[in-house]
Regions:
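Acidic helix N-cap motif at the loop->helix transition within catalytic regions
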Residues: 9-13, 32-40
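Terminal low-complexity segments of carbohydrate-biosynthetic enzymes
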Residues: 206-289
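A conserved acidic beta->alpha catalytic loop
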Residues: 17, 27-35, 50, 80-81
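Short, well-formed alpha-helical segments that are part of the catalytic scaffolds
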Residues: 6-20
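Catalytic donor/gating beta->alpha subdomain of glycosyltransferases that bind UDP-sugars
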Residues: 94, 103, 107-122, 158-222
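Long helical/loop segments within the catalytic core of UDP-sugar-dependent glycosyltransferases
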Residues: 56-57, 93-149, 153, 202-205
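Conserved donor nucleotide-binding strand/loop of the catalytic core
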Residues: 35-64
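Short beta-strand-to-loop acidic/aromatic patch adjacent to the donor-nucleotide binding site
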Residues: 70-79
Length: 289
């Protein structure tokens, strides 16, 4: 399942990579022909005639899966491409009745720049954090660009400001595990700028903070610190990017902490998208109303 808003440029690569897999696209009020393109590529399309946000789109996708008897679904971003065999590995990891969700290793791709190297370090730390969670707790955070879950394990996601955090918490509360599958990978667009990294991290931390029982490894200081050290040991060339990555992450956390105390920010986060340019355009449109 793919929740898409103006993704006509990136969607074809993903649909081609998915091949004959059953694909559901929720077109969330796109104006660039995303829905038509998805239908032409053979996907099932649900259409919102106005933009309703990621949570509403994901809820429609979950309802469709339940109504049509899908026991396990994979949710992914429109700008992502799964590694060969990774979807199959995700599905296989869900065979145990004790498992309600599963996530993969995320690898950003893009032009080698300052923002790319910082981004690459941040995502490698997340992967190491999930590995540590599996060792210490036998379960891990679900969130990411691509993950699988059993729809029956999830209560309504409508109104949530961070959908994958919401799913992860739902699965945990219902007594299921979320597993990390490190040999399954997904490639996705790296952050386009320092501002884009800040937006992404700020949104993620906001989502973690509004859920007191967040499962995110970044909210466990011991795991986060150990994950950073493991990531640097895995690839020492990441060391020059450690300080800017840590400072950027701390600033993102402080911004999110402030946002979490502002009720009017919740509506803005509900409509948030991960593409920096789209958020800039949306903010500009709101300021001119």
């Amino acid at each position: 399942m793919i929740c898409a808003y103006n993704e006509a440029r990136t969607l074809p690569d993903l649909l081609e990579a998915l091949g004959q897999t059953d694909v559901l696209v929720v077109d969330d009020g796109s104006s660039d022909g995303t829905g038509r393109l998805a239908e032409m590529e053979g996907a099932i399309v649900l259409t919102h005639w106005r933009r309703m946000g990621k949570a509403a789109s994901l809820q429609d996708a979950i309802d469709y899966a339940l109504d049509n008897g899908y026991g396990t679904v994979v949710e992914m971003g429109a700008d992502s491409v799964p590694g060969k065999g990774s979807i199959e590995k995700l599905i296989t990891s869900m065979d145990s009745p004790a498992v309600g969700g599963a996530s993969v290793r995320q690898i950003p791709v893009g032009r080698k720049s300052t923002s790319y190297y910082i981004d690459e370090l941040i995502w490698s730390v997340l992967a190491q954090g999930k590995l540590l969670q599996m060792v210490r707790h036998g379960t891990s955070h679900l969130g990411g660009v691509m993950y699988a879950f059993k729809p029956e394990c999830v209560s309504s996601v409508e109104g949530s400001v961070n959908d994958d955090e919401h799913l992860s918490v739902c699965i945990k509360r219902k007594g299921y595990k979320s597993v990390f599958v490190p040999n399954a990978v997904v490639y996705f667009d790296a952050s386009s700028s320092i501002g884009h990294i800040l937006q992404r991290r700020r949104r993620m931390y906001f989502g973690h903070m509004v859920y007191p029982d967040s499962t995110a490894p970044s909210m466990e200081i011991g795991i986060a610190a150990s994950a950073l050290l493991r990531s640097l040991a895995e690839k020492p060339s990441r060391l020059p990017w450690m300080l800017p990555a840590v400072l950027l992450d701390l600033f993102s956390r402080m911004c999110a902490w402030r946002d979490a105390r502002s009720p009017k920010k919740i509506g803005e986060y509900a409509m948030w998208v991960t593409t920096f340019e789209k958020n800039v355009a949306s903010s500009a449109a709101r300021s001119h109303r």
